[in-house]
């Protein structure tokens, strides 16, 4: 079963980040045999790194063995709905930290897969994570 790749890991590779680039690239290579996918949210978040050129972005993803056409399904919406409601409830009671809704969408999407490859494991508590 495939792994979902978080935006930060792909940006590490794209930007050849001095701190995280090599580890992120090696992590992707190590999980390639299981399959690598991104959520529609990550597809959108990557756009600025390619100046909005979808063709260049898709070439980068293809070179790195990452599928980008996996659809968002209603079950993802239902999971996201629950995750976001829980997040807001915790925040209102002072038990949660500020969290972008994009992370909730990525986590909801990742629940259908083996887990999430991310540098931010604390942001994704309901799915298995691999940190490069």
PLM-predicted stretches and their roles:
Residues 1-38, 48-62:
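Short, well-structured N-terminal submotif of metal-dependent ribonuclease cores
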Residues 2, 107-132:
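Acidic, PIN/NYN-like endoribonuclease modules and their adjacent C-terminal/linker elements
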Residues 54-57, 87-88, 132:
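Short, hinge-like loop/turn segments at secondary-structure boundaries
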Residues 68-119:
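Active-site neighborhoods of divalent-metal-dependent phosphate/nucleic-acid chemistry enzymes
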Residues 5-6, 39, 99-100, 120:
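Histidine- and aromatic-rich ligand-binding microenvironments
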Residues 45-46, 79, 126:
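Phosphate- and divalent-cation-binding pockets in alpha/beta enzyme and binding domains
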Residues 9, 42, 76, 105-106, ...:
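Alpha-helix capping/helix-boundary segments
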Residues 62-64, 127:
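Short, structured coil segments at secondary-structure junctions
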């Amino acid at each position: 079963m495939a792994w979902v790749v978080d935006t930060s890991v792909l940006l590490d590779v794209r930007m050849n980040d001095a701190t995280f680039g090599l580890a992120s690239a090696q992590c992707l290579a190590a999980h390639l045999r299981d399959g690598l996918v991104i959520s529609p949210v990550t597809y959108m978040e990557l756009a600025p790194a390619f100046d909005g050129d979808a063709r260049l972005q898709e070439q980068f993803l293809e070179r790195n063995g990452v599928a980008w056409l996996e659809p968002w399904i209603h079950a993802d919406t239902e999971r996201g709905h629950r995750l976001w409601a829980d997040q807001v409830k915790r925040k209102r009671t002072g038990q949660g930290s500020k969290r972008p809704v994009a992370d909730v969408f990525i986590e909801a999407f990742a629940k259908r897969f083996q887990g999430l490859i991310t540098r931010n494991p604390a942001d994704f508590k309901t799915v298995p994570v691999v940190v490069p």
